């Protein structure tokens, strides 16, 4: 069987993708830290596709933003713990495409990670696809998966 191609092997594309993902993750962190959906969603494309950690598929900025705005308007006891975002892996299969795995770690009141066996609060692993248009990076798609113990 012939060897399959590597899609993320251009160092210039990868450097640009890493910078874009770092900036995007910093924006998510700032939005969640301040409870501001405008900041959190600042670079979600108008036609963003979003997979929620509860299995819903949402399409369009207005739909996703309205959910995040309601979520951030709730008191912390309802919205959940504070969080820390961590970039796990970045790929650049093209000059204007970044694909990233980003972990959201749920934190307790002391800033320590909440265990994966907690039934009400959970961390997530997200897969984000960013696309550059007119020198600006936009989130085209995101899929969020709760991190849970193996069954």
Identify the function of each model-found stretch.
Residues 2-38, 49-151:
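A beta-strand edge to alpha-helix "cap/lid" segment located at domain peripheries
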Residues 45:
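Helix-to-beta-strand junctions that scaffold the AdoMet/dcAdoMet cofactor pocket
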